[in-house]
Amino acid sequence: MNESSESPPPSRTFSSLPYDIILNCLARVSRYHYPTLSLVSKEFQSLIASRELYATRSRIGKTERFLYICLNLTKSNPKYRWFTLPPVPNEQKLLPVPLFTYHLNSSTVSSTDSEIYIIGGLVWGNRSKKASIFDCRSHQTRRLPKMRFPRASAAAHVIDGKIYVIGGGEIRGEVYDPTTQTWLTTPVDHTTEECQKVYDKHGVNICFVEIDNLLCQTFVFNGKLYWRHPRGDDFGWARVKGVEQELFRNHLSYVDKSGGGRRVTVWWKSVVVFGCQGLGYSTEFDTEIWCAEISFERRGLKELWGFVEWSRKVFTCKGCDSPTDFVMDSVLVTY
């Protein structure tokens, strides 16, 4: 038989590959693309929602850190909305998190793996014992047993899978064990140093970042970025150098960790006016949410330099009713 007349070998589709190979391939793709991939077929949708996929990502070292942030975009009728900021170069933008709306005023958030804990808060002005957990993979929220003490604006930290909580109007600490699903009272001395440092912020938005094995404090004041060594008695707060010319026109309002080690994200908003009518007045506005990621470099004992890695608009909402303190909370999630 003439070779040219032979039928070509049948082509193999992606879904015909062995299951383990499919998981390995998908695990190497950024989670940013998973919503799009889930639209390919029901099989893909099932694979992307499977625990096996995330176990594979963890096993081959392909987990990613996503920043989840809660915004209050309406001052007249406060309604908190959660977003995620994927770590995708040149494509940073806030994506709404579906089915994640629960967030009491003055509650505390902490995370372990793909789960976000929401602890305490204010209900009609009273501190709450409520606690819940949101699974970022399944987008499901479930209630946890109530805490032993009501708290608002407490501090929380995860150690060995257990949630340690202190402060928030109660001098006693407590710890939640997911295995037994119980809260137990614990001395404050038994909580971690990191948790104690967060508790010391007294309501001020202070972010801790490790730079050259030194844990530094950073915070925003009057729209400027400051830093200090929390145990340094010889000098206080100092301006972060190098970012003044980059961001001096923007009134920074919030600072938090990013997924890049010695880096932070800073947040601000601006109002855009358009469609002027009559005497130049306009009732049409857009509120733009901006974000920048800043990396740090120490130069001597008393100088910290900042470098803007990227800066861009990440979200736009209609109107200009967004409150000044529009960032309610944020947390890093790894999976």
Curated annotation (Swiss-Prot):
Organism domain of life: Eukaryota
CDD domains: F-box_AtAFR-like
Classification via SUPFAM superfamilies: F-box domain, Kelch motif
Keyword Cytoplasm appears in the UniProt entry: no
Gene3D superfamilies: Kelch-type beta propeller
Name of a matching Pfam family: F-box
Domain F-box: 11-57
This protein's record includes keyword Repeat: yes
PROSITE patterns: FBOX
Chain segments annotated as transmembrane: none
InterPro entries linked: F-box-like_dom_sf (IPR036047), F-box/kelch-repeat_ARATH (IPR050354), F-box_dom (IPR001810), Kelch-typ_b-propeller (IPR015915), Kelch_1 (IPR006652)
Keywords, ordered alphabetically: Kelch repeat, Repeat
Residue stretches of each Kelch repeat: 115-161, 163-211
UniProt name for this protein: Putative F-box/kelch-repeat protein At5g02980
Species annotation: Arabidopsis thaliana
